[in-house]
Amino acid sequence: MKKMVFLFPVCVLIFLECRDSRELTAENPKAILGHYLFFEKRISFNHSKSCASCHSPEYAFTDGYRKSVSADGNNLLHNAPSILNIAQNHFFDWDNPEIHTLSQQIKRPLYNKHPTELGMDLDSSSLLSFFKKDSLYSSLFERAYRGENEMYSAKHVEECIIEYVKNLNSRNSKFDQHLDSKAVRLNKSEEEGMRLFFSTELKCSQCHAPPDFTKSNTSNMVDSAYANIGLYNIANENKYPAEDVGLNKITKKLRDDGKFKIPSLRNVMLTAPYMHDGSVRNLDELLNIYSAGGQSINKGPLSGDGRKHRNKHPHIKGFEISDSQKKNLICFLSSLTDTTYLSNPYFLNPFRNK
């Protein structure tokens, strides 16, 4: 087996500033209002879904489904990504590199009709009237928009949800504590897994870069933040499924077929299933795909050898990994788990005790 060179980038020591969310909301009435709106089912067209339906605290603000379910009961195209730590991202969408801000991103889940997600009506007089008449919401809107002529508007709903989401920061994992003070030590298995993660052989960190183990907030270059990992190669014709081709949908360039946003690995133990389409059930399956240099499917409509897709990222070459090494790597990934946010009311459903 080749000797692995352990590379630990300096940037892993540089963490984004993170203040306690309780402190932030105390001085940010829009975030307080946004907290309630995020968990409010009335913002969906039939009052069946909220933002939290697809981004639940229990699953690190994902939903546990292969593909999320819309307010009208249909499966959406993609797996719900975590929205923890996304305020500094340059990219937000699985396959649309033109979405650079939360203000742009929020419009699709709120208003889209084809397909419907929440299906909120931009001019929903009944929803805005409810906010105005409800004692809780009228008080919260008054605090957030006192003095404005039009307190109750779809624009303000967007703005407050964004303020809430911007403060959903989770960087208190065992790994973070180990780096921060050295008072918490990684165990032998976690340390060996970290060595593998940053090695030149596996190259995990080349795409999943600290501090948040993604390129979405460390690079504003599309080719750095999006990649084809050799998941599909329909009929060996260098194609992904026609309904979900990746960046090619927007750019109309064949070289972008199969490229999707590289997700964060923070809390990855809580966010299964994996990939843009939720097709990978667990980390063991995922590592098998990477170690093989992509996925080969032998039968069915998706059959083809993703390992040979012409757009596959050059780092996805495959590697040898033993069962014990795989276990160690998963132990390291587990050290990126932070559930301390579950003790912070700001992250939880404010209606849970009502």
Go through the PLM ranges and name each one.
Residues 124-143, 231-234, 254, 292-299:
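Amphipathic, soluble alpha/beta structural segments
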